[in-house]
């Protein structure tokens, strides 16, 4: 069983962009290439899922479960952020064994809970806030509380907007001189969206510690390899090399079933058209 996650920058809906990279049909081709049994998409689409996407994924054998973010208004209710949706897909052959629920984290944003009875597995799909470490921590606390009630093996997939505190890259970004220098740069270039400051906060590592240090979860990728690039929506002239790891697959399995995880199968995919790289893991 292959389980995957990929932040696709709302590319399953059609809206005007400055560039034409990775339209909905390109994302569908990428999904076919990855060939997951279960896959989660933060920022799947805004407003409306493209009809051709529904048809194409149905032909590929998938059931689609879209869930609206319903996030508290943080000033971004325009363009690709308007009526933003999460999406979980799974193969039709698992239909009789799977139930999908919507959960609420920190009364801020929805997340998805997939329960696979046959495989004694719960898969959470989450997208933690990208603007506030405080909100990320509260969302992580809620996720820890909700998941602690489950007896099954657990995977948490998604875009955490958070790095591990032990990651050498986050250590560099937490260096006081480096941090001050980047903040000065942000002011100099009039960084109105606080992209630099927000990235620095993602390096604090405190949100992930709620789940790892306090919640007993571990990251599938202990090497902490990067998953995001600068080649983001409307800035696709920027390079595609990977910079930071904020997409994670966390796990909590019991001692007997830990052998189900094929750690060597963990994969970070090539550039498939988003600023995030898709990631996947196989279960035996």
Locations of regions flagged by a protein language model:
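Active-site beta-strand/loop signature of hydrolases that rely on acidic residues for catalysis
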Residues: 3-8, 30-50, 123, 142-169, ...
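Short catalytic/ligand-binding loop motif for oxyanion handling, primarily in non-cytosolic enzymes
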Residues: 11-14, 47-50, 73-75, 132-133, ...
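Surface-exposed cleft-lining segments at the edges of enzyme active sites
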Residues: 12-15, 125-137, 194-195
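Structured beta-strand-rich core segments of catalytic domains in phosphoester-bond hydrolases
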Residues: 44-128
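Conserved beta strand-loop-helix elements of the APE1-like EEP
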Residues: 76-97, 116, 209-214, 240-259, ...
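Short proline/glycine-enriched turn/loop segments at secondary-structure junctions
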Residues: 76-77, 235-240, 267-272
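Metal-dependent phosphoesterases centered on the DNase I-like endonuclease/exonuclease/phosphatase
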Residues: 139-246, 251-254
């Amino acid at each position: 069983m292959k389980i995957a996650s990929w932040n696709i920058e709302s590319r399953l809906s059609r809206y005007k962009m400055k560039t034409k990279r990775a339209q909905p049909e390109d994302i569908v081709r990428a999904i076919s290439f990855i060939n997951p049994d279960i896959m989660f998409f933060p920022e799947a689409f805004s407003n409306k899922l493209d009809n051709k996407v529904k048809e194409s994924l149905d032909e590929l054998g998938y059931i689609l479960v879209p869930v609206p973010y319903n996030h508290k208004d943080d000033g971004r209710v325009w363009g690709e952020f308007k009526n933003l949706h999460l999406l979980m897909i799974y193969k039709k052959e698992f239909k009789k064994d799977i139930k999908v629920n919507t959960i609420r984290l920190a009364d801020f944003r929805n997340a998805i809970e997939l329960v696979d009875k046959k495989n004694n597995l719960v898969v959470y799909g989450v997208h933690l806030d990208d603007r506030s470490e405080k909100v990320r921590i509260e969302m992580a606390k809620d996720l820890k509380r909700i998941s602690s009630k489950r007896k099954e093996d657990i995977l948490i997939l998604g875009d955490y907007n958070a790095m591990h505190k032990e990651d050498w890259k986050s250590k560099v970004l937490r260096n006081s001189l480096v941090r001050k220098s980047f903040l000065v740069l942000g002011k100099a270039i009039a960084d109105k969206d606080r992209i630099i400051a927000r990235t620095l906060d993602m390096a604090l590592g405190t949100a992930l510690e709620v789940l790892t240090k306090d919640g007993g979860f571990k990251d599938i990728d202990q090497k902490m390899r990067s998953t995001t690039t600068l080649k983001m929506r409307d800035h696709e002239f920027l390079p595609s090399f990977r910079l930071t790891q904020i997409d994670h697959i966390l796990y909590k399995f019991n001692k007997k079933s830990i052998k189900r995880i094929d750690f060597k199968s963990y994969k970070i995919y090539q550039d498939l058209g988003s600023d995030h790289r898709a990631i996947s893991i196989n279960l035996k």
